[in-house]
């Protein structure tokens, strides 16, 4: 559960970062 949650969080975090980066850039 912890590993799966970490993977999901990493994917979501990467998506948010790339979206924020695109918007900022």
Swiss-Prot record:
It catalyses: Preferential cleavage: Ala-|-Xaa, Val-|-Xaa in bacterial cell walls, elastin and other proteins. Keywords: Hydrolase, Protease, Serine protease, Zymogen. Its EC number is 3.4.21.12. GO terms for biological process: proteolysis. The keyword Protease applies. GO terms for molecular function: serine-type peptidase activity. InterPro entries: Peptidase_S1_PA_chymotrypsin. It is an enzyme of class 3 (hydrolase). It comes from the Bacteria. Belongs to the peptidase S1 family. This is Alpha-lytic protease.
């Amino acid at each position: 559960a912890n590993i799966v949650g970490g993977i999901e969080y990493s994917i979501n975090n990467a998506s948010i970062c790339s979206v924020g980066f695109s918007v900022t850039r």
